From Swiss-Prot:
The active site is at H41. Catalyzes the conversion of precorrin-8X to hydrogenobyrinate. This is Precorrin-8X methylmutase. Homodimer. PANTHER family: COBALT-PRECORRIN-8 METHYLMUTASE. Pathway: Cofactor biosynthesis; adenosylcobalamin biosynthesis; cob(II)yrinate a,c-diamide from precorrin-2 (aerobic route): step 8/10. Disulfide bonds: none annotated. Keywords: Cobalamin biosynthesis, Isomerase. It catalyses: precorrin-8X + 3 H(+) = hydrogenobyrinate. It comes from Pseudomonas aeruginosa (strain ATCC 15692 / DSM 22644 / CIP 104116 / JCM 14847 / LMG 12228 / 1C / PRS 101 / PAO1). It comes from the Bacteria. It is an enzyme of class 5 (isomerase). Substrate binds at S15, R38.
């Protein structure tokens, strides 16, 4: 029989202990410490903590919004599926509109990606929500355009789009001017659905 740890909770405990031993968390505020640990856990790279950028009080803002029942708006199904429902404090709605029937036609009409124009369906849910971008840079660019045009403001933006075209730029644009919305990003090309969902899961409950 192969010798390996079979207890899921023991694996989590050892993983988080290893992260805290190896990662430099000195610059992470208390309200984002668990978020940083879970983002590292999701990608396996302790150095990603060096690329985390955030506005003051972002973690507290996200926790308060979720506790108050805020909707969680996700740019991709993989992000939405990664949110652990049992951790959510108020049976929060997890919304992804990418597969709405009119999105392909809307993308053609507006001359943008489906990931971007799917945010048109977010308008009624945006105010006070937690926005989670874990895939498409165009979705984050489009969100900023919507806010510039007067769309309601979410309570928090978790900006984790990934890739080689627009990912770094969209996140830097958010950090440079968050339109008055608290935010957390990982700078550069790194990001993705697993890290984005991990950030939500960390804010959803005080449980490790």
């Amino acid at each position: 029989m192969i010798d390996y740890i079979r207890d899921g909770q023991a694996i989590y405990r050892q993983s988080f202990a290893t992260i805290r031993a190896e990662a430099n968390l000195a610059g992470i505020p208390a309200d984002l410490e668990k978020l940083a640990v879970r983002v590292i856990h999701a990608c396996g790279m302790v150095d990603v903590v060096d690329d985390l950028r955030f506005s003051p009080g972002a973690g507290a803002a996200g926790r308060a919004a979720l506790a108050a029942g805020a909707a969680i708006l996700c740019d991709a199904r993989m992000v939405a599926e990664g949110v652990t429902r049992s951790r959510l404090p108020a049976a929060n709605r997890v919304i992804c509109t990418l597969n709405e029937a009119d999105v392909p036609a809307l993308a053609t009409e507006l001359g943008n990606t489906r990931s971007a124009v799917a945010l048109e369906h977010w308008r009624e849910h945006l105010e006070g929500s937690v926005v989670v971008i874990g895939n498409a840079p165009t979705a984050l660019f489009y969100l900023l355009e919507m806010l510039d045009a007067g769309a309601p403001k979410p309570a928090l933006i978790l900006g984790f789009p990934v890739g080689f075209v627009g990912a770094a730029e969209s996140k830097e644009m958010l950090a440079a001017d968050s339109r008055g919305v608290p935010y957390v990003i990982v700078r550069g090309r790194r990001g993705g659905s697993a890290m984005a969902a991990a950030a939500v899961n960390a804010l959803a409950t005080e449980r490790e």
